[in-house]
Amino acid sequence: MAIKRCPASIDVVEAAKIRIRNVFRNGLPVYMSFSGGKDSLCMSQLVMNLIQTGEIDPAQLIVQFIDEEAIFPCMEEKVREWRKKFILVGAKFEWFCLEVKHYNCFNELSNDETFICWDRYKKDVWVRQPPSFAIRDHPLLRPRIDAYQDFLPRLCTAGITITGIRTAESVQRLQNIAVMLRAGKSMTNKHQVFPIYDWTNNDVWLYLLREKVDIPEIYLFLWQSGTKKGQLRVSQFFSIDTAKSLVKMNEYYPDLMERIIRREPNAYLAALYWDSEMFGRNT
């Protein structure tokens, strides 16, 4: 599919602000997906600035964080900081620690590509403990059956969801959003808006720098270990993007690999084959 890019008369930051203001003007609850990663930090700073200038109502805002258990310590720390910020300005922050299915690249060989976050039958080997204030269950959730992508849409039907998805992340995302934009008004049937969809990687890092937003230190560690700027992605440990960097991060988090292997025995594959075709490298 051919995709035509149209230049705008305003910069991407101002465009994102306009989109966010328009969402809040509907008067509906606004659900914001939050991960603690660079894109969601940009979204959060944009929203926080608009709250502080009185341009949007924080009482409409419900921030949602799906805690996938296997996350870096600095990511949890950053999410805690932002949880406090949002609560202090009058927004609601939902921190979910749920038994949801997640993709597990280490289980490809056994034909089982799922991982159950916060598995009740594996409490003794959880990578970390959930916060005391976390939401551990929900009537709309089908535990151990749903992925969070199944659960959240059911939870957010009463409002509009804003998410920090960007077309620069992948060709697939570019094509998907192009199709949605071409659909015109029908795209709103999904109740989703992507305020920073047109931001480049440079836009993201420049905005975080100019706004003096603290980022999780894992990004600095990845950069120091030789990861290219366009590949600075952080997700749950058993996703392909993060799995291939686990061995490098063992230098910065000495006990982390041990805890990961205890939770997911096949994770030893990362130590043996991280620089091979298994993790996207052709050597």
Residue ranges and their predicted role:
Residues 1-31, 38-283:
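Nucleotide-activated chemistry modules centered on ATP-dependent adenylation/adenylyltransferase
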